[in-house]
């Protein structure tokens, strides 16, 4: 079924104005709650042990760095920060335990809703777990910290293996947006391919390759080609990267799209007329699934998130509807999708969920 979506804006973490709209909703029948108790759940991946690892933005904090370093422009900034981010894991039976906590977490200004970011995503290289930080940096209220890639050690400690704050500051993109510029970046999603990590940064607009402990290389300056379109989601199909975007405020109908980026950085648009993309994933048959945060509303609205499957050129089949402020998704070993739900916003703490979406057999 082809759908002409009305775009809603998901703006948390990305330096764009946000209003959370509450409403009544009903999830599609193939959606169930798999686990609860998360603080702003974000990217999630299954590990080699069969457990699901969930990154959490945390609950922000009250520490300020005003007067110490450059701040994110108002009304998004100034940020405050704390060490409330964490990574949790969920067993196949739904039992939740903490892998590592006390990681950097920040929140926007009160005028912007105290919206939280922290650990943005996780990925495995072999049996080693890595985390993508978006909640650190002096511009986010935490002096002496940096956004980057953390290696999670067997004893639960972490080691910084790539300083992405430093990389951004010394390798500017062609077309940064000064009105909401984030010095430390607002990293969003990460995938592993061939033992290398690939991460998307929405505020600057880039896809970067990270060799843990070695070096960082920009694969594509999306801002140079597309301008400030706020790329968020990345998936890899074994040959190329696929990147989805939110687009910017004010709202424009059907403004999100999916782009293909080759390992050489060549970019082409492959799917259009989508809304508020926050997740992409391929199934075992190579079919692409798209997670939309909101549709049919002018602002992010609970109960209007959806998962679509690409069935031909700009034809999309609904797989799940009625999701509430979803932020990421991944396929499980059972062939079903797992989605971070109630994944952004201010407290209450512990309101985040992971949903299980049974994917139709067709």
What do these predicted ranges mean?
Residues 53-57, 130-133, 199, 242-245, ...:
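Residue position within the beta-strands of beta-propeller blades
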Residues 69-92, 96-123:
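Blade-loop segments of beta-propeller domains
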Residues 37-49, 83-84, 105-128, 146, ...:
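Beta-rich, blade/repeat-based domains predominating
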